[in-house]
């Protein structure tokens, strides 16, 4: 078999694996595998997922209460904690205990543990007071939930009137959902459109909770 055929075969296998993973995820959404959490900080991903650049359009500021839904290994949690300052608070939520622990270690190493409260739970029912959150951030996590509308209903409960929700998705993630589908979910949940940034490869939606 020639080199060209080998390359074509390898490419076909890779594409087939990607298609299979996406179909399986669409049938049965599931969290990002914890054993692969090191890939969340891979330099290739950081080319388009730099925490400062990703969070910039969401309007974080000193004194805010921010909710990191599906915090994973804390890739964005640390930067959230920096931006809310000493008077702010970050609630980091993940359904996988090992992810919560990895994020806790990371935040502690950054010297920001006093600003972050961790919750090992799902997004359908969170141990947070109603009307207590200024901003909820979901980065490649809403698409991992079997019932995204249940999560959005819970987020409406915990968000303050006038609070914001930022949903961001990226094409390399096997659970990727196009922005028009996420917009339909957010509209159905009662949020008001606030803007779209990025491109089909990696986009962010901002919506408001009008109460």
Residue ranges and their predicted role:
Residues 189, 198-211:
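Core SAM-dependent methyltransferase catalytic element
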């Amino acid at each position: 078999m020639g080199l060209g055929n080998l390359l074509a075969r390898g490419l076909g296998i890779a594409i087939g694996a990607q298609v299979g993973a996406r179909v399986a995820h669409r049938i049965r959404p599931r969290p990002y595998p914890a054993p692969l959490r090191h890939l969340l900080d891979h330099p290739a991903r950081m080319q388009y997922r730099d925490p400062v650049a990703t969070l910039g359009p969401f309007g974080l500021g000193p004194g805010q209460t921010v909710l990191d839904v599906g915090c994973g290994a804390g890739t964005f949690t640390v930067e959230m904690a920096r931006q809310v300052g000493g008077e702010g608070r970050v609630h980091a939520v993940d359904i996988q205990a090992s992810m919560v622990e990895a994020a806790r270690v990371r935040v502690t190493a950054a010297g920001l543990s006093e600003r972050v409260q961790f919750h090992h739970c799902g997004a359908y029912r969170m141990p947070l007071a109603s009307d207590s959150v200024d901003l909820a951030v979901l980065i490649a996590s809403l698409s991992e939930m079997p019932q995204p509308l249940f999560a959005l209903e819970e987020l409406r409960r915990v968000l303050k009137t006038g609070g914001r929700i930022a949903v961001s998705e990226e094409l390399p993630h096997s659970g990727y959902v196009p922005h028009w589908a996420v917009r339909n979910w957010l509209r159905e949940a009662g949020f008001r459109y606030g803007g779209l940034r990025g491109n089909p490869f990696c986009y962010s939606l901002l919506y408001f909770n009008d109460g």
